[in-house]
């Protein structure tokens, strides 16, 4: 099938979906390309971002955790966005696209529940019905977000198959969409999946990096040495990276979930520890068994518990433009506690992975003068019960 936009990033990406979904993806690409050129669509999107979601978000300088070092650390505060995370940005764009295509229903998948909440709020705002698939394990560990979705009128369907986590929710959502795409739009929640989703999600998240660039120049008079973001599927990271890719003096650092440790096999770090395969409609690195079956990923944070990664991240990794590292559950938890105790900010466990790597960079070289920006992709209200249970089991509270 010929496409309007390049469906690949190097060798990664593509449209590996059943033939029945090709017309839906073609229609979506056409709607997106025309919307990008339509000043009225852009004005409506920007108005929602500003007056509904609360953009631009703040760039906060850490006051205390850098004490005794020469590091200057800023946080891009996506946690302050309506809905509690960066997810709200791109769902508003996709919901407007759904209306533009004449769709009446939204189908979505969610892990931590943040994309589900964002999908539910956008659907409520724009008068769309909303059905959300969520792994049964995630329904259990993210009950506050499940109730938020239901309060806003969404139907939440627990998925018990497979590992009962995000990858299984993705499979069920795609299955539903293949039978209902004439009236429903599949609101994919990350910068992964079949073309054109990785491109659409990047473009509807790129204001994160655009704002960061303008804000850091205003505050510091120069660009940062590195921007750091957590990577599950990779939408918050690609939103931060997009406007810096051509700024070759700015390091791009993506942080994958190391779970219980890479050596245990219980992690979610396919970029550095997976093999290229085809899954979820795309060619990308993924966690696979010896015989090529998709392996279960693991992370303390439901939103990073995904066995693959967006194709543009795979490309940035293959070219060396971005560096990808991993942070364990324990390291993320320590960073979570540090930010709470010393800056009065409760971060999402996902974002805590990025913060943990920034703290590691700072502590490993305290004399080094460096200007770092962490994308604080979401707030940690949803995670307080998970953290409470872990700390209680350890006897720390």
Swiss-Prot record:
Modified residues (N6-(pyridoxal phosphate)lysine): 87
GO cellular component, one term: cytoplasm
Names of the cofactor(s): pyridoxal 5'-phosphate
Catalytic activity: (1S,2R)-1-C-(indol-3-yl)glycerol 3-phosphate + L-serine = D-glyceraldehyde 3-phosphate + L-tryptophan + H2O
A Pfam family this chain is assigned to: PALP
CDD domains recorded: Trp-synth_B
Disulfide bond residue pairs: none
Gene3D superfamilies assigned: 3.40.50.1100
Top-level division of the source organism's lineage: Bacteria
Function: The beta subunit is responsible for the synthesis of L-tryptophan from indole and L-serine.
Name the record gives this protein: Tryptophan synthase beta chain
Organism: Escherichia coli O1:K1 / APEC
Taxonomic lineage: Bacteria, Pseudomonadati, Pseudomonadota, Gammaproteobacteria, Enterobacterales
Gene: trpB
């Amino acid at each position: 099938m010929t496409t309007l936009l390049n469906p690949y990033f190097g060798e990664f990406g593509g449209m590996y979906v059943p033939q029945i979904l090709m017309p839906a993806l073609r229609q979506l690409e056409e709607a997106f390309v025309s919307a990008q050129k339509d000043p009225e669509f852009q004005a409506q999107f920007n108005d929602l971002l500003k007056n509904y979601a609360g953009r631009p978000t703040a760039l906060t300088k850490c006051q205390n955790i850098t004490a005794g070092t020469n590091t200057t650390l800023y946080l891009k505060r996506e946690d302050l966005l309506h809905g509690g995370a960066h997810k709200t940005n791109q769902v508003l764009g996709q919901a407007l696209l759904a209306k533009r295509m004449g769709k009446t229903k939204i189908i979505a998948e969610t892990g931590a529940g943040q994309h589900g909440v964002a999908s539910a709020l956008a659907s409520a705002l724009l008068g769309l019905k909303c059905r959300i698939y969520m792994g049964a394990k995630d329904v259990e560990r993210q009950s506050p977000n499940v109730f938020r979705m239901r309060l806003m009128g969404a139907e939440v369907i627990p998925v018990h198959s497979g590992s009962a986590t995000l990858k299984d929710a993705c499979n069920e959502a795609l299955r539903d969409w293949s039978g209902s795409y004439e009236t429903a739009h599949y609101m994919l929640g990350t910068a992964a999946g079949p073309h054109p989703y990785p491109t659409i999600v990047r473009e509807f998240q790129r204001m994160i990096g655009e704002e960061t660039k303008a804000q850091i120049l205003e505050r510091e008079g120069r660009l940062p040495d590195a921007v750091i973001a957590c990577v599950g599927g990779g939408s918050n990271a690609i939103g931060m990276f997009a406007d810096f890719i051509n700024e070759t003096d700015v390091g791009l650092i993506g942080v994958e979930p190391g779970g219980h440790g890479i050596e245990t096999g219980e992690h979610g770090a396919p970029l550095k520890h997976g093999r290229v395969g085809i899954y979820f409609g795309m060619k990308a690195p993924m966690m696979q068994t010896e015989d090529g079956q998709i392996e279960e990923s693991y992370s303390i944070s439901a939103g990073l518990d995904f066995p693959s990664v967006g194709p543009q991240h795979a490309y940035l990794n293959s070219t060396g433009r971005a560096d990808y590292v991993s942070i364990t559950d324990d390291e993320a938890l320590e960073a979570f506690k540090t930010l709470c105790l010393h800056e009065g900010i409760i971060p999402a466990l996902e974002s805590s992975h990025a913060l943990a790597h920034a703290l590691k960079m700072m502590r490993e070289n305290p004399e080094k003068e460096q200007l770092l920006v962490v994308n604080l992709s979401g707030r940690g209200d949803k995670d307080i019960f998970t953290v409470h249970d872990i700390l209680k089991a350890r006897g720390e509270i």
